[in-house]
């Protein structure tokens, strides 16, 4: 154990909380003078609201002139590029057309291509027949159904019957592109959203996101579409519903090849969604959106002045009020740019998804802007196909069918291995360089100052020790609850054991046997709850069981606002160390930090005067 003297330190924990979070037996070991189970989430949401308010001020100013509006949109686009990350060099798509299914007035081509080496993408191309080529075309980006493109798409059939080709793309984790599968290709997770969430955690460690990777695959799908002589490259659209609506929103602002778009059953405001239901699954978020003041309507606004349609249901779980507020911004934007007719919204007496009425409006919108045709939508035959006949792969999954296929997990491991030498080079740099980069990753602009306020909240005298309760307050941060155990045998040289554990301090203190030996040895015990643990643990029912653990919603909100939980908890540790430096019972005593059921790699930066023993 290292002993730190004169220790103004920064303890940075890099890693993840693992294991099942257990509700602490707090009871008499509560140190906060208040009780509010959702306090931590409320604290985080204040930043969400502040960021949204700042964004509102900026967009209202942009609405005052066309030049201001264009400047706002370009600013959104540049900030979006920063958070979506970089993409690989384009390589050969290695397209394979593996089959053809005949429909009524159209045919479906079954196609496989590589968006990057080893990443196979399965698609269906609904191609209208008896049409003058080249024809207009659109991408259909799939919602969250586990079967992805599945056995058929009613919207694609309707589009094809009206002279518009449709390329339906299997996203990562759906259709024939499941990643978490057994040797036979059977899914190991509960639905697409669970797989998306688990895969996104791995992507986040590499500085990207599942949403960004979906963008890349969709971009390459459009690249393929434009290689075809029977497709008109000047008449291209994109649409999607639910998770496909998410993909559409994230896609359209960065690809000028898209001339018309429609977002169904996704469009609302992020602020409103986080308030009502909390963060969604892993493909629905790109880290730091809030920090960069990017709202869901901003991704749609980047489509302007190209035609855009919003499709909503009055009884959708996607909040209609937020959708209406966002659409009002779209209307204002398009009006300022002089093209109010190029944005529209349909709200129907239904819930989630792309139902009949929405499909009719969708095809009508695309006919108008891709074909200059406002005639009534032609009905399509409701053809039915067997799922087995519609598969592009021999075994139903690319990762067990295609030679050289790489799972997303293997891709990520390969990327980590590729970066190994870069990590070694980085760690050879000076302390200040490393510290600056770590602070950036943790969402800390700088180390907090020493200013904390110590509030005593309770005191109990026991036979062998005195028990003191405190809440430690640092401006702008969550208060840190802690309990100090001063044994009767303590002296000027007694070490302080600062104990931090996943279950909270109450679990440790509720069993006398846990600390009896420390009392006998005269050790001073300081037990505390880092934010989101112990006294401020988020109630489990606010996070769906399919997500990581009960910390999911607060972890995702923290990433959204640009303040990862790990960085926030580093500030809590600093607050505790400042407490040890300032409180009359503790100043001058050596401090040892124990992490229990918290997996950390500890990096400690010390003042020049600090001494290690």
Predicted regions span which residues?
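Primarily recognizes the serine-hydrolase "nucleophile elbow" in alpha/beta-hydrolase
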Residues: 220-292, 576-613
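Generic beta-strand/beta-sheet core signal
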Residues: 126, 169, 239-241, 246, ...
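Mobile cap/lid helix-loop segments that gate and shape the active-site cleft of serine hydrolases
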Residues: 197-198, 204-205, 259-301, 305, ...
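Bacterial N-terminal signal peptides
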Residues: 9-21
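Alpha/beta-hydrolase-fold serine-hydrolase catalytic core, especially in secreted/extracellular enzymes
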Residues: 24-120, 304, 311-497, 503-510, ...
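Cap/lid segment of the alpha/beta-hydrolase catalytic domain
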Residues: 132-227, 268-279, 285, 491-583
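Loop/turn elements at helix/coil->beta-strand transitions in domains of secreted/extracellular proteins
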Residues: 134-137, 162-165, 232-235, 256-260, ...
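Positively charged n-region of N-terminal signal peptides that target proteins for export
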Residues: 1-8
